[in-house]
Amino acid sequence: MNTNFDIASQGSSGLALQQNRVLRNTYMLLAISMVPTVLGAMVGIQMQFSFMAGSPLMSFLLFLGIAWGFMYGIEKNKDSGLGVALLLGITFFMGLMLSRILQVALGFSNGGGMIAMAAGGTGAVFFTMATIATVSKRDFSGMGKFLFIGMIVILLAALANIFFQIPALSLAISAAAVMVFSAYILYDISRIVQGGETNYVSATLSVYLSIYNVFVSLLQLIMALTGERD
């Protein structure tokens, strides 16, 4: 009986160590991924990537195509160094795309403050969701289907609003995106804590994309509500 208990304890301890290692490596790679994101944003601002705004639909489809291509490559190579390299590549690309909304924000007299506010809000969301997932030890995997449906609805609404250009719909999409992707951070980190995600490259990609979308959506809301022209 004692032998069985010892084996079970060792197995449980080993699983906990693996989960902690995946979580630690995810946070480390997530922090590193912010470097190419910032570099990409700086390059995009310098290169005036706003020219892509001339064709919103084509830009949207091009963005999705390149992003999904990166994500496919990362998942196929997540157990090798190439997966890490592709992950850093997509974060640089996302930084380039981020430069468009940053240029718009910097066009306001309080642009720097709005960007800082969005960054601070995103950080607060991340730390709150990460703490809940880690401390509560609850299994939030049941949220997955609902969050996926929510993400698809947001994607379709964003695509439709490219044609309709309804300001109120744009605000609603941004608000919904903040809620859905904040919940995705909770869901993704919970999967690591519960042992549902054992690859830190895949985990980093999921959490990074959620953080990115929370930041962009928060910035859009802040610009719409507090933006000041000279």
Locate the predicted segments by residue.
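A hydrophobic alpha-helical transmembrane-helix feature that marks the membrane cores
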Residues: 1-230
